[in-house]
């Protein structure tokens, strides 16, 4: 039996930082995607709100015109 056989396990330490770095990059990319999607949703919401307000104003003018 070899005395050093089970005493120490070799760990793949050089790969660990690369895997951690890759995971951090993926997390960062995911956060950027979420941030971009959120900004797009807010922009779309603003446009839709403005359009809704324009249509409501048009409707109110139409109702005032027919009421007189």
From Swiss-Prot:
Task: List the subcellular locations.
Answer: Cytoplasm; Secreted; Cytoplasm, Cytoskeleton
Bias (Basic and acidic residues) occurs at 7-25
The reply on keyword Cytoplasm is yes
Q: Tell me, which GO biological process terms does this entry list? A: axon development; negative regulation of protein ubiquitination; protein secretion; proteolysis; regulation of metallopeptidase activity
Q: Name one GO molecular function term.
A: microtubule binding
Would the keyword Methyltransferase be found if you checked this record's keyword annotation?
A: no
UniProtKB keywords: Coiled coil, Cytoplasm, Cytoskeleton, Secreted
Q: What is its main location?
A: cytoplasm
Write out the function statement from the record. Enhances the tyrosine carboxypeptidase activity of vash1 and vash2, thereby promoting the removal of the C-terminal tyrosine residue of alpha-tubulin. Also required to enhance the solubility and secretion of vash1 and vash2. May play a role in axon and excitatory synapse formation.
Give the family from UniProt.
Belongs to the SVBP family.
Question: Could you identify this protein by its name?
Answer: Small vasohibin-binding protein
């Amino acid at each position: 039996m070899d005395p050093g056989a089970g005493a120490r396990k070799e760990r793949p330490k050089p790969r660990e930082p690369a895997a951690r770095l890759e995971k951090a990059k993926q997390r960062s990319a995911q956060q950027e995607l979420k941030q971009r999607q959120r900004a797009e949703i807010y922009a779309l919401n603003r446009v839709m709100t403005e359009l809704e307000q324009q249509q409501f104003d048009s409707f109110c003018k139409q109702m005032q015109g027919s009421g007189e």
